[in-house]
Amino acid sequence: VKGLDCEEGENRFSPLNLTAATLGDRLHESDPKSKVVAVAEDPYSAVISGGSTGSAFWLDPGKGQWVSSSYYFENLPFWVKKYNEKRFASSLLDREWVPDKSFAAYKNTDTTVLNFSARPSGFKNFFRSILKIFKKEPEKYDLASLLYTPFGNMLVTDFAREAIILEELGKDDHTDLLTVCYDSPRLICEYFGPQSIEVEDMYYKLDREIGELTGFVQAQFKP
């Protein structure tokens, strides 16, 4: 197994060691024409969600692009390559993580790295200040840091919408399955702490992300 459209030796993920059948596997077993698509930032989340018979896409954090492996495809689907050309992740690097509320409105006010008085507009220059483990090229450092912000959730939502449209999910009489996993909440929680303002603010934003995605799905399949 090898990664597709990535550096040699990277993204070599597959469900070859997955011993249990997933929901998608059972769906495909009952109807081989059903499509199963898994989308996640983390390759393990994508592989486990996609199962052994579906397809899985995950984020290459160094490039900010969506990838897969030769287990699922001979070549990365054309629509994914075209999507990656938009460089959506890179376009988010100039954005600031702006809190949804004033400091007093948060419940978890005991723990935060954010100085509200010094930076009232948000987490200015945030990407340059977190995760010193990323010491390679500046852009690669920044793109990987995106996953530790609510912008990581935005990457997943945007790609999931694209997958629904271009994989033509739900467009025939065969039941399709799309699994979407947001891994940024776990990363943000691990880095800032579960009782931090950062985690609380991220969940407010994630709630909107999920609402937008479910609203998009409902709009695609109105009777």
Task: Describe these PLM feature segments.
Residues 1-174, 183-190:
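His/Asp/Glu-rich, glycine-adjacent segments
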Residues 162, 199-201, 215:
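A cross-kingdom marker for long, charged
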Residues 181-183, 195:
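Mobile, glycine-rich extracellular loop/lid and propeptide segments
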Residues 194-207:
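Active-site-proximal segments of metal-dependent phosphoesterases and phosphodiesterases across multiple
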Residues 205-223:
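Metal-dependent active-site segment of extracytoplasmic phospho-/sulfohydrolases and closely related
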